[in-house]
């Protein structure tokens, strides 16, 4: 398989060759990591933690190397593409002229369909290659890598939560399962709305109309609480503060470039840990849950 892929890469342009080589290097690194995991006993927590940190470092180094390679190629490609396009155009013009002089062949409908299909396939491959560059250099990828490294140092990893407006509540619902608590998203929303509504004086000073900058009126406050309970309104720090009081549990929010935010520090016990991602989706901020890194390590090593 490797041989045929290399031959295919050689037939493509520089970008396709680079992307395919980088994919191969990723597979080779994953194979190496798997070997490292298999060499460490599952019950050796200290070495498992060291392994997790080393794996995160190896992956980050490879991603940085790939990013630099893609950046250099992207900077070098535009001028070369112009030269290639001109050369291809001249060659095609000369070839078509000779063919017309010789026999004036007719192109069948089937041939036109095949050519159109080939052109669409080429365009699709170019879009995929561009997406590969964006995935390796974009803010979303860099944020994911940084958060993965921060969590790996704590023997944790991101657990994906759907982006549907309920992400913060779904992430807390997921975390509560570890606390043997069966609260649903609907229950969490209803309790949050009730708590904020009953603590009007504590929350109102932090709620302002985005258009006027004025503090919410009583009607706006009522609508705000109703939206929490009955819509997919996105939850933020005020809702987290309310939930920490409702659950009497500290809630920690891990983020990329700032220290973790902890609400409900007055409560003891195991904190609920959420991951705040600014670039995860085009619509904006998103919350994910976390899980023990050993879950994935054990599965891969078994």
UniProtKB/Swiss-Prot annotation:
Q: Positions of the region Cys-loop?
A: 161-167
Tell me which PROSITE patterns the record gives. OTU
Q: Which cysteines are joined by disulfide bonds?
A: none
Q: Where is this region: His-loop?
A: 276-286
Chain ranges of the OTU domain: 156-293
List keywords of the entry alphabetically: Hydrolase, Protease, Thiol protease, Ubl conjugation pathway
Q: Entry's InterPro entries?
A: OTU_dom, OTU_OTUD6, Papain-like_cys_pep_sf, Peptidase_C85-like
Q: Where is the composition biased (Basic residues)?
A: 106-116
The record's function comment reads: Deubiquitinating enzyme that may play a role in the ubiquitin-dependent regulation of different cellular processes.
Q: What is this protein called?
A: Deubiquitinase OTUD6B
Q: What gene does this protein come from?
A: OTUD6B
């Amino acid at each position: 398989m490797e041989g045929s892929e290399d031959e295919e890469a050689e037939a493509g342009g520089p970008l396709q060759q680079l992307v395919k080589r980088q994919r191969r290097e990723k597979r080779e690194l994953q194979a190496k990591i798997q070997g490292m995991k298999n060499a460490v006993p599952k019950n050796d927590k200290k070495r498992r933690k060291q392994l997790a940190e080393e794996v995160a470092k190896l992956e980050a180094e490879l991603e940085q190397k790939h990013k630099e390679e893609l950046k250099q190629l992207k900077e070098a490609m535009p001028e070369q593409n112009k030269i290639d396009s001109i050369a291809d155009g001249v060659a095609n013009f000369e070839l078509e002229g000779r063919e017309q002089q010789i026999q004036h062949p007719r192109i069948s409908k089937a041939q036109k369909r095949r050519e159109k299909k080939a052109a669409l396939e080429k365009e699709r491959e170019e879009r995929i290659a561009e997406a590969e560059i964006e995935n390796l250099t974009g803010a979303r990828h860099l944020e994911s890598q940084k958060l993965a490294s921060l969590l790996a140092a704590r023997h944790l990893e991101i657990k994906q939560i759907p982006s549907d407006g309920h992400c913060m509540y779904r992430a807390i619902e997921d975390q509560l399962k570890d606390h043997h608590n069966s609260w649903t998203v609907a229950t969490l929303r209803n309790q949050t709305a009730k708590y904020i509504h009953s603590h009007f004086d504590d929350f109102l000073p932090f709620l302002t109309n985005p258009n006027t900058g004025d503090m919410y009126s009583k009607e706006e406050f009522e609508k705000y609480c109703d939206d929490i309970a009955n819509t997919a309104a996105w939850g933020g720090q005020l809702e987290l503060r309310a939930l920490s009081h409702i659950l009497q549990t500290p809630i920690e929010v891990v983020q990329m470039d700032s220290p973790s935010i902890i609400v409900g520090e007055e409560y003891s016990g195991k904190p609920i840990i959420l991951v705040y991602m600014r670039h995860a989706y085009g619509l904006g901020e998103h919350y994910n849950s976390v899980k023990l890194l050993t879950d994935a390590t054990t599965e891969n090593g078994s």
